């Protein structure tokens, strides 16, 4: 009986109720900005989110993320002459000189708090040998995170015509960075002691440029801000990325090309987000999907290959405070993005009207050891056609069909190619918002092999 009810719930679309209006009572003065739900990646509000600008030192968020994924904190970094002197004059520095050594940990604090450009170069050389080779890793990581409008040519963010980002891409990078515990700890730090080096034989204390975590800057300080990174060059103007959290609701914000309003714009975005939206745990409301892991197993296989169909109980969606979970609808997407969990067979997308508000993955796990396994052969046989009907759906856009991103000189803030500011834009087009019809062949096979545990 339970099986029948679950399959009916999956196969029969939910009744579409009149959804609550999406709030839009916010504006910013900077040329581009965004507030993104850090749990789901849903865009809450954006202005020119795919226009490209020079990022300045918020580039170091991506540099730090790559370092944290590839290095241990106690590794020793040696500062080369190129690392120390291949920077613009009077740019941010922690005072390291040629031949100095420091731990990866100290370099990261210098990078993210002091915004030390020589630390960015030294870390890049430590990993890749040269800053140019490290830039290759930066672009690969950005693409892995879903970035399509950006290109990186150095680890520090100094001016280069081939170094540019969009607000949306930078939000994806910042969201990923705040998912790293070490990154979150560093950018929340208000004071750190760097060990002695040649120019500072007694060591030095450093503090972040981000005023939103400093109580001695009352006009900018916010207790809900959990960290961030500032940037400035004469071309980029002021840039700022911030993470903030109240309860289970967590946002990241990005401001680009700001003429001094980066903090007031960020505060406006955060006030808008926390006053108008709430994070909702899927498992608290959607009993159809949240109980899959407890109630269903895929059988008809040898005992050693039995699988459990599960969904992450901690997955959240973001909703306006006036909206109810019952107003959301569900679609399944079988074109999984990079970084999908092992054993994932589909992404369950939650939408409010036409807007994606969150997602969770359906995954297959070993029923005994809870280790991820490959899909059962019966499902593999139907995957190529039944589970990936993208070629038959003219509404699905493909990254390979997209024109190359314009550089900073082609800032198309008002161009026709830009989506309306209130729409989630490309995120919905490429990844989550396409409502694919559930392939009947897939469910026929699943209905045969799924039994109540």
Regions found by a protein language model. Name each.
Residues 1-19, 443-453:
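Sec-dependent N-terminal signal peptides of Gram-positive bacterial secreted proteins and lipoproteins
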Residues 7, 14-18, 31, 122, ...:
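N-terminal cationic amphipathic segment used for targeting or macromolecule association
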Residues 7-8, 12, 40, 84, ...:
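Generic "edge-of-domain/loop-turn" microfeature
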Residues 16-168, 172-181, 185-186:
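Active-site-adjacent loops and short helices of periplasmic peptidoglycan-processing enzymes
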Residues 147-148, 162-164, 169, 174-444:
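Domain-terminus/edge residues, biased toward the C-terminal soluble/receptor-binding domains
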């Amino acid at each position: 009986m339970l099986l029948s009810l679950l399959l009916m719930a999956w196969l029969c679309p939910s009744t579409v109720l009149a959804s609550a209006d999406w709030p839009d009572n916010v504006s910013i003065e900077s040329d581009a900005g965004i507030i993104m739900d850090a749990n789901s990646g849903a865009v809450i509000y954006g202005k020119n989110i795919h226009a490209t600008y020079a990022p300045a030192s918020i580039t170091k968020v991506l540099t730090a993320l790559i370092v944290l994924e590839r290095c241990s904190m106690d590794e020793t970094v040696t500062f080369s002459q190129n690392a120390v002197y291949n920077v613009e004059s009077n740019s941010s520095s922690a005072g390291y000189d040629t031949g100095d050594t420091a731990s990866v940990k100290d370099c990261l604090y210098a990078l993210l708090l002091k915004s030390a450009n020589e630390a960015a170069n030294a870390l890049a050389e430590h990993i890749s040998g040269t800053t140019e080779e490290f830039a290759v890793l930066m672009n690969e990581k950005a693409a892995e995170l879903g970035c399509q409008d950006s290109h990186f040519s150095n680890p520090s963010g100094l001016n280069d015509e081939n170094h540019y980002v969009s607000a949306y891409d930078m939000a994806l990078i910042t969201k990923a960075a705040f998912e790293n515990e070490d990154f979150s700890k560093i950018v929340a730090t208000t004071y750190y002691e760097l060990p002695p080096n040649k120019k500072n034989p007694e060591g030095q204390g450093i503090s972040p440029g981000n005023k939103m975590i400093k109580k001695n800057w009352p006009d900018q300080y916010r207790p809900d801000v959990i960290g961030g990174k500032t940037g400035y060059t004469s071309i980029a103007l002021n840039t700022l990325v911030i993470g903030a959290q109240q309860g289970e609701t967590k946002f990241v914000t990005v401001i680009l090309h700001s003429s001094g309003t980066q903090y007031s714009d960020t505060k406006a975005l955060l006030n808008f987000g926390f006053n108008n939206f709430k994070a909702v745990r899927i498992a608290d409301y959607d009993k159809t999907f949240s109980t899959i892991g407890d109630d269903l197993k895929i059988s008809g296989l040898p005992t050693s290959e039995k699988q459990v169909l599960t969904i992450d109980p901690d997955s959240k969606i973001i909703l306006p405070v006036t909206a109810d979970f019952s107003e959301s609808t569900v679609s399944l997407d079988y074109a999984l993005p990079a970084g999908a969990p092992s054993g994932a067979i589909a992404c369950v997308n939650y939408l409010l009207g036409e807007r994606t508000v969150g997602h969770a993955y359906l995954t297959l796990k070993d029923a005994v050891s809870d280790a991820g396994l490959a899909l059962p052969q019966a499902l593999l046989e139907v995957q190529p056609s039944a589970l990936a009907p993208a070629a038959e759906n003219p509404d699905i856009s493909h990254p390979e069909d997209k024109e190359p991103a314009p550089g900073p000189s082609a800032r198309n803030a008002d161009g026709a190619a830009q989506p309306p500011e209130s729409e989630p834009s490309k995120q919905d087009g490429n990844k989550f918002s396409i409502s694919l019809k559930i392939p009947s062949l897939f469910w026929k096979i699943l209905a045969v092999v799924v039994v109540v545990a």
